[in-house]
Each structure stands twice: as structure tokens, then as C-alpha cells.
Amino acid sequence: MKNSLLVRWSIVVSLAGFIFGFDTVVISGANQPIKELWHTSPIFHGFFIMSMALWGTVLGALFGGIPTQIWGRKKVLLWVGILFTVSAFGTALANDPYLFSFFRFIGGVGIGISSVVAPIYISEIATPTTRGRLVALYQFNIVFGILVAFVSNYALAGFGGDNDWRWMLGVLAIPSILYTLLVFSIAESPRWLITKQNNLAKAKEILLSAGVANVDEAVEEILSGSSNDESQQSSVGLLNKKHRRLVALAFMIAFFNQLSGINFILYYAPEILEQAGLATRDSLFNSIAIGSTNLVFTFVGLYLIDRLGRKTLLLIGSIGYIISLSLVAYAFYAHTGPVFLMSFLLLFIAAHAIGQGAVIWVFISEIFPTRIRSAGQSFGASIHWVFAALITLVTPVFLDKENGIFKENPWPIFAFFAGMMVLQLIWVLMRVPETKGISLEELEKKLLSKES
């Protein structure tokens, strides 16, 4: 494919990741002001204010594959932008915690669907040699959105007085509207047109405009993969025994992604840093360092993913997780101070960006056959969001300075996450296959042959 057109389509679609990332951590700046405004209890605050968007992502991820298969990738990407926009305006203008939670839920549905459809779309238009980097653009935009949200929260703190949190949340409407308009400029996935619409003429037209050297050969390869899907997997579905290994791989990578504690740290970064001894505004500023580190090392992950491969990056990340989380736990346990703690929080973020952060959406999007890719992506994404929601829900019960179980010394939380990363390291060594540099159709044959 012509690099310029391929990259342009990928960048547009990956902007959904920017909104995903921004929305993920913007709540960290609004967390304390909302708690003080509506006098929420730790349990209510955890369920309605902090994790309601994540329950929306679970719903969106779980069922997002259905419209993605029926309506096509492009239409669903467009609706994702509409959901983002409605959520941004709704949360900024909400006058009670229930209405606020409703609009956070709407935005979460959009994020959940985007985590299904965006990686699928990019993986289907990419070539085998560029697929890792291009799908990882989605992850890059997630971390770029995270950084921009931290900067925005810091810049808007105090702006509008007690209503600064409304500006923090409402500013998301700008990229949401821009993304929605840009989606009109992309083409539909040729693989979807062939496998679901049998529209070979339109698919060939798109492949030709994108610069595919041998259009007929590309179409034949897609048709061959589609034929294999039908002949080998007529009882299509994730419960088919042929797919057990694929389902297990998607489950485990999503499970370990959240059991690293990444969303816990991103959602509660200012509060964690305050407990380490930083003032509120200093904690918001240091959150920017977390976002910046995430962005820089995501570049490293993007550079390495198609060179070293997915499995190697997961191994590197696992070792970094274990070291950093163990030392963060020690920092809280021994009261070493904010500088020591911050250093190893940044090491944790770097390990995540190079490892799980760079790999998860690429890996899930490429391991499933074309005809169940939407369902597989939905499954993996929903597992990711279920555990993200559960962790975010229970965090105030453990972390709250006044009523939390650990109050101002949450070292056992980080020790638990470190232990989970030891298990991830063992799993990667023993179970994870390498997928770099292989066409989706060849990868399907490789993984299913091992399963059988």
C-alpha cells in the first residue's frame, strides 16, 4: 500500500485512542473536587464517579463486535465519535452525580467499542511488515491522550474556580468533534467488504487506490482465508474448541494488563503522589512526568515491536514491572519519600509502555481468524475493561486517606501487583507465540494448526 494513504487512514482511526487515553485519566483531576462537591462516600465514589465509564467500556467492548461485523468498520468508528462528543458535553454540564455518571457511562461505551473496532480496522488494512507499528499507533495515541489530559488538568486547575473540573472534562469535546469529521475521509476495510459483503469490486477499488501491487493476488488471499474460516469453523464462535488457545491468549494478556496496576496508577496518580507527601498542585504537575514518560517509551515500543517482536517486548516489560512495583511497595512501606517513589513509578510506566502497552491491542487484533476477529477483539477488550473497572471500583476502599483499609500507606497494593507480574513473566515464557512479520492468513493457519 502507498505509505501516505495507509498512514493517513491509520492516524485518523487511531485518534480514537487519543480520546480513549484522555478520557481515561482526565477523571484523575476531577476526582477530589467532585468528591468534595457532592460529598460522596468511598464506595459510591468508586462505583459511580470513578468506575462508571469503565462499566460502559465493558458493555461497549463486549457487544462492539456485533455492529462492527454487521455495519462495517467505518460506520461504527463514526458512531464512536458521536458517543465521545455527547459524553464530553454531558459530563461537563451535569448537575448531580447520577447524571454525571450516566454521561461517563456513555463515553465509556464509546471507548469500549473503539478498543474493538480501531485495532481491527488498522490490522486489516496494514501489510504484515507494518502491522505492528500501525496498530500500535492506536496505543501511541492512547498515551498521547493521557499526557495531554495530565497537562490539561494541571493547566485548568483553578480555572473557573470550583468549576475547574467541568472545563477539564468538557475540553474533550474538541478532539471528539474533530475525530468524527475525519472518519468521513477513510475507506471501508477491504477485508470486511470481501468477507461480509462479497463486494469484490469495491474492495479492489480501495486496494488499488491504496497502492497494492497485485490487487487480484491480495483479494485471492483474503478469499482463501475466508473459505478456510467457513470450511473449518462452520460453528463459528469463540466457544469452538479450535479457538480455545486463541481465547486463552486474549484472556490472559488482557487480565495481566490490568493486574499490573496500570489503570490504578493512571486513575489515582495525583492521590497516590499526595499520599507520598506532595501538595495537590505538585501532584498534578508530577502526573505530567508520568504522562511524558509513557509517551517517550511508547515511541521506543513502536520502534521495537516489528523488530524484536511481541513476545520479547512482553518479557522486557514483565521484568521492568517486577522491579519497579516491588520498589514502589518498598517506598511506601519504608516511607522513603516522594523522590524515590516517583523514580520507580516512572520506571513502571516505562516498562508498561515498552511491553504490555505496545503489544496488547496489536496482539489481540491479529491472533483471531477474520470471520471471528470482531468477536475475539470484543472478548479480549471486554476482559481488559472488566478488570479495569473492578480495580478502579475497589481502589477507594483501600486507598482513601480517611476511611480506606490501608489509609496513607498502600504498599500491599503494589506488592500484590508485583506478584501478579511474576506470574505474567512465567506465562509469556511458556505460552505466548511470536506473531511479528506474518500475514493474518498465515498467522491463522499457524495458530489453529497448533491448537488442533
What are these regions (language model features)?
Residues 215-227:
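Short, well-structured alpha-helical segments
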Residues 1-201, 205-208, 227-452:
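Alpha-helical transmembrane bundle of multi-pass membrane proteins
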Residues 213-216, 279:
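Conserved H-loop
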